[in-house]
Amino acid sequence: MTTDDVWGWSFDVCGIKLYHEKGYKGQGITIINHEANSGHSAMTTNMLKRVAPAATVINARVTQTTSAEKLYSYNWKIDGKTYTFDEMYNTFKPDIISTSFIGTVCKERDDMLKGHIENGDFIMCCATGNNGAEGVQGVYRNVAINVGACFFRGCKSKIDIMPYSGRNKDNLKVDYVGFVGDGSGTSNACPFVAAQIALFMCRYGKVPQNEFKQIIKPYCIDLGDVGKDYKFGDGLIVLPDKEIIRMKFKDVSQNDWGKSSIDWIAEKGIMNGYDDGTFRPDEHLTRRELSVILNRFYELIK
């Protein structure tokens, strides 16, 4: 079986071929490839451009000086010029950052990145690592979308699993792996997923990270146990080919801890907002209203 045969199979299953045929190839989306400081640069760039050929891909060589709590320097070298993180962000305005870099604990850096992510500035994808510690701390701190690998070799029955670092399952949280992508290692699978997100944004518009995760979960293929599991997370992402309803209530802020759940139950028709565009999240339910909600949920899942 040739490499093109393998790619053809996964591109079909994951919806990539269909998106390309419909003209969604990542145009208008900027991806920072945080891999220019390793031998992964050419490999990961090729993956990004293969899945999202019209996206703008910028390679960055990143250096940082940190302690467990303090960020002393965080520089991004792009096309021979060095930028601080803020300068990089303000200059290139990335929609997606693809990386396998988050291997050391640094609260200040991680909090800064999480602030940008929660504000909807960009989505970050991080490789969980094949058999080392890379990615582990970033995964545990819940900064990025954590990507494991499953190399299909052309069909679902022949999968090489590399879903996480070499820690046994007893030391892993169930949310260690967020999703998996096709690739012969997590550093390959991560740009696969990042580029899928670029295709999604090209079709449906730019979305915050938490909202993307909630939208895409129903379209994922379980590769292991039914539901979320420690090896495959929510599974293999399949790009949707339908209208996506994105609920926006003017009294539910982007940083509201319940936003993703509120959007989901509204999209599914379990609860609705009010005619004035509000959800009124602090209002109480009556027993009658609760009965209706539970019945709608039952009808949805049965």
Feature locations, PLM:
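Acidic-leg catalytic submotif of subtilisin-like serine proteases
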Residues: 1-3, 7-43, 126
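C-terminal subdomain of the subtilisin-like protease fold in secreted/lumenal serine endopeptidases
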Residues: 8-17, 86-89, 94-98, 144-146, ...
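Structural recognition of the beta-strand scaffold that forms the well-ordered cores
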Residues: 30-35, 56-61, 95-100, 123-127, ...
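Subtilisin-like peptidase catalytic core
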Residues: 35-108, 223
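Hydrolase catalytic cores
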Residues: 48, 60-63, 176-231
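Catalytic-core regions built around general acid/base machinery
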Residues: 107-125, 142-143, 260
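Extracellular S/T/G-rich loop segment that most often corresponds to the catalytic His/Ser-adjacent loop
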Residues: 136-202, 206, 236-241, 263
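Short, solvent-exposed alpha-helical surface patches in non-cytosolic proteins
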Residues: 194-197, 245-247, 256-271, 275-302
